[in-house]
Amino acid sequence: REALVGSFDSVNPFIIRGQPVWQVRDLVFESLLMRSRDEPFTLYGHIAETIDVNEDRTAVTFKVNPKARFSDGEPIRADDIVFSLETLRDSGRPNHRTYYAKVRKIETPDELTVRMELEPGDRELVLILGLMPVLPKHIFEARDFEQTTLDKLVGSGPYTFDTVDAGDHIIFRRNPDYWAKDLPQARGQYNYDTIRYDFYRDMQGAFEAFKKGEALLRTETDASRWAVGYADLEGQPVTLEQVEVGL
């Protein structure tokens, strides 16, 4: 349970409109490849079981893991990848539109294979495409993608929506049927049964919630508050850990 500052009126983090809950991206949705946080821009296969890139990086082929499923049980297929790219390219956020427009051609030789021909000159484009969120075509094709929504969207990630209370709090629940739970990249992760975010109007309100035990996790970015603001928590079951972040 974590206290955040702000509010939200949408659970779709892929569009320009509205104020979304950004955590939806990593908890509910997934990408073809998965990033390794302790290696510089290093990706490993996830929804894509294999990836094949030509020498000058102007073509890439992704092979979808046949075990990959959305949380409603529907299998992930090549058509979902094509739908995701075209939808985000045409209606997504500016970064999606910029990068995905560099895909000259996309084709599906079979239901698990996606081949893309790319504009030359961008050697990172293959990696960026690998981080593209995969959307379920059968859910989104009947919706107006560019409109904000508080509906409990379907993804393939380790968590699903439990409770959505606009502007107040949101709760995610671990999916016991998560398709990748036994894969090596998921071991030791996604250990919480529920994850809750409560929203406060200002930083002080969020801080007071933490001090009262209404929030169990807090990321402190204010040096002065870190130095003196936690003094009255001494003796309580609170662990303070300083992490050096290199930029």
Give the residues covered by each predicted segment.
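Gly/Pro-rich hinge or "lid" segments in bacterial periplasmic/extracellular proteins
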Residues: 36-38, 130-194, 204-205
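Surface-exposed binding/hinge segments that line
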Residues: 63, 97-140, 158-165
